[in-house]
Structures are given as structure tokens and as C-alpha cells.
Amino acid sequence: PDATFFEVITAMSFLHFAEAATDVAIIETGLGGRLDATNVLTPSVSLITRIDYDHQYLLGDSLAEIAREKAGIFKSGVPALSVKQEPEAEAVLREAAEKVGAELRFIGKEIEFSSRFCVTDESGAHMRVCLLGERMRYMHLPVPLPGSHQADNCALALAALDMVGGKTDEFDESVIFRGLAKTKNPGRMDL
């Protein structure tokens, strides 16, 4: 069968990263996990964002079915992280991770996390995130993107950085703080 457009551009991006000797590439799946073109890689860590009723025509009609497809990215010996999920999705993710031999940890359960909505003169409306990783403590980091899901996604990224990011002294929290403060996603949830 012919390759899809997504498969071709995914292969092109992998070639580009290899030729550019990229140190780290953050690769997002297209729709799911199990049959996704990105699943040919063995990552340093696998991340699962909030599972919801998206792309049901491809992934399934229940959260459990969708979670089973998403869990297809889990690899033996590769740690995995997930944001908090509905119980039926969490159960499927835990079962799938155990089956393939991937250590799965949940933000807000195995990894301490809190977030809150704030409004300040300096930053306007935003979320603040606290996450206690194994090596780093991220306290009151600003997430200027609207929506609590953005705080969850930030926590997921911070936990991944904490898990696979190298030596602790290589990361200056002030750099992360400044980078997050400048984060923008024009056109998303703008009026």
C-alpha cells in the first residue's frame, strides 16, 4: 500500500533530525499510538495527554478503547507518564504498561502536582503549576496559555524533563520560568 501524507512527512522529519544531528526531538503522534507513523521510534519517555472522545472513528467508541490505542506507544523498558485520566482509561493504560514492561507514572498520583488559576497585574490571567519531581522541584511556574489542560500539559513536560533531562544542575529553573512566561499559542482559544 502507498504511504499516507502523514507517514511521508513523518519520515521526512526523522531524516531531517538525523541529518541535523538533533540532540532531542519532541515527537507528537498524529492521532493515536498503536498504528501511528511515529510509533517506529523508541523514545526516551512516552507521554499521554488527557484521553477524551476524539477521533472515535479511528480509535474506538469508549474511553477504554481509545486508551488502548493510545497505550500502543508504550515500549518495554521506556518510562511513561500520563496526566490524570478517567478511571476506565487509567485502568487500561496501567494494564497495557505492565503488559509491555513500561513503568507508568501519573501526574497528580505518583508525581505530586498542583495548579491554580491566578490573575496578576504583571501576567494577567494564567495558571500556576507546582510539580515535585525526583530531581527537581518546580514551584509556582506561570503557564500563560488558557485552560487547566495547559497546566496539565506543562506538568507532563516538566515531569519528562525531570525524568530524562540529564544532570540536575544543567537546568536552571529561572530559564524554564522565563520560557513558560513567553509561551504563546496564537489562534487557540483567542476571541
Annotate each language-model stretch with its function.
Residues 29, 50-51, 84:
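Glycine-rich, N-terminal phosphate-binding loop of Rossmann-like dinucleotide-binding domains
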Residues 50-58:
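Conserved Switch II/interswitch segment of TRAFAC-class P-loop GTPases
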Residues 71:
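Bacterial c-di-GMP phosphodiesterase catalytic domain signature
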Residues 39-50:
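Inter-motif core of Ras-like GTPase G domains
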Residues 43, 76-78:
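Short glycine-dipeptide loop
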Residues 1-3, 60-67, 78-191:
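Adenine nucleotide phosphate-binding catalytic loops in nucleotide-utilizing enzymes
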Residues 1-41, 57-59, 65, 87:
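ATP-dependent carboxylate-amine ligase catalytic core
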